[in-house]
């Protein structure tokens, strides 16, 4: 009698090299790394550089240097090439086009000729957060109508989002129920300028790279519904997801790369890796004090915290004290 072996945990960190990492990026990377290492899994590094106007190889090299300084190593990725290369999304466009061809064959995508201005004129922001739901203006165009419109305007491509809820158990937030159609409508998978959209690229990459666990910021929680629908449309099994709280200042404003004191470049001049790790672990709630600690020491601490903490494991937002970057 044969027994099936559990699938090894395979996590990933997939930053965008648009600037120096800030504290929020570092917390995501740390939690993704700790979750994988606490399960004896593998870590993948992927560089999400689809936006040529903001992302450069130089910034990617700096990003990897910062991760290495903190000790957040990866088993596969740039510098550790294995079977899933290339690891820069800008070099994976043929894979995204292949996925689009598969979706086209099932009529799961369609051309959209709407401009941003036209959509703003007919839509209201969803839930007041600035997100617009696409009202389906081009969903039922005939081939002849689409051909006529394409003579004067290059279309984007949208995915036909099923009008049903996506449910999953978030590692940190607990049970989730997302209706993509009611929240976003049919979402873009390739922009009108030919750049593949985040939702498609990240889904294709996670599927082809064998990712089984994704830890990232809570701002991406709604996107999980879109990605899970794409996984199912492509006949793939989605990974397990965990979303961590957004970092905010005491006024409740979300931290950004403009917070210079919380930029990794500044933090590296003020702290050793062990000092910074201790402060981050204290901020996230699994160390009582912001004391120096190594990654090796943090793994069992995280494991105990995860086992003993109820769900949700974090508050929705995490307030960064004013003196975080003061030694």
Protein language model regions, located:
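Hydrophobic transmembrane alpha-helix bundles
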Residues: 78-93, 111-126, 148-159, 274-289, ...
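Active-site cores that bind ATP or allylic diphosphates and position pyrophosphate for catalysis
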Residues: 117-256, 263-267, 319-327
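Short, mixed-charge aromatic SLiMs
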Residues: 51-61, 249-251, 300-309
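Noncatalytic linker/hinge segments flanking ATPase motor cores
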Residues: 22, 85-90, 151-153, 199-204, ...
């Amino acid at each position: 009698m044969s027994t099936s072996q559990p699938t090894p945990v395979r996590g990933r960190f997939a930053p965008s090299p648009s600037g120096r990492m800030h504290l929020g990026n570092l917390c995501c990377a740390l939690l993704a790394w700790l979750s994988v290492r606490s399960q004896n899994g593998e870590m993948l590094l992927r560089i999400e550089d689809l936006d040529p106007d903001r992302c450069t190889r130089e910034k990617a090299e700096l990003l990897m240097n910062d991760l290495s300084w903190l000790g957040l190593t990866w088993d596969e990725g740039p510098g550790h090439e294995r079977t899933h290369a290339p690891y820069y999304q800008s070099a994976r466009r043929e894979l995204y086009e292949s996925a689009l061809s598969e979706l086209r064959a099932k009529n799961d995508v369609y051309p959209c000729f709407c401009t941003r201005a036209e959509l703003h004129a007919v839509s209201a922001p969803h839930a007041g957060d600035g997100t617009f739901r696409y009202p389906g203006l081009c969903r039922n165009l005939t081939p002849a109508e689409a051909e006529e419109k394409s003579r004067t305007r290059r279309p984007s491509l949208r995915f036909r989002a099923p009008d049903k809820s996506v449910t999953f158990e978030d590692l940190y937030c607990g049970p989730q129920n997302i209706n993509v159609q009611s929240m976003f409508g049919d979402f873009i998978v390739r922009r009108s300028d030919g750049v593949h959209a985040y939702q498609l690229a990240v889904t294709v990459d996670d599927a082809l790279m064998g990712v089984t666990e994704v830890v990232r910021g809570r701002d991406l929680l709604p996107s999980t519904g879109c990605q899970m629908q794409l996984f199912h449309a492509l006949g793939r099994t989605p990974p397990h997801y965990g979303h961590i709280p957004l970092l905010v200042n005491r006024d409740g404003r979300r931290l950004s790369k403009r917070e210079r004191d919380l930029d990794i470049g500044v933090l590296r001049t003020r702290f050793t890796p062990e000092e910074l790790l201790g402060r981050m672990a204290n901020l996230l709630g699994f160390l009582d004090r912001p004391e120096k600690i190594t990654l090796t020491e943090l793994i069992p601490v995280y494991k105990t915290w995860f086992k003993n903490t109820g769900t949700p494991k974090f508050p929705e937002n995490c307030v960064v004290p004013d003196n975080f970057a003061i030694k």
